[in-house]
């Protein structure tokens, strides 16, 4: 049975608005506490990068290859790949605010970029989105990221 909520005090079913408010906040606090147990966000590449490439999920390999290629060809880039997104790692805001240019590369319509904007205000995020049903093509990533660096 779903959709039932227990009383904060007795554990019995409750439909009271005040109790609902308490329970919503209690559940959110439990999720937020998970951040104490997940690893911090790591950045690969140049510490003083001109562009931070951000990804999550199954995009790691293609984005890492793009970063490695660009660095080998003299571009100052870095790469952060999120393994946890709710909650975000505790150092997410500190890491992202270090970079003037950030590109979030996703194989969807950009939901993670929007989520980051909501969770970390003040970011200047560019997006590279593809909805092809196929993995990224590394050459396309390199071309798009190089163009961003030149802007």
Predicted features, each with a name:
Residues 1-151:
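Flexible, low-complexity linker and terminal segments
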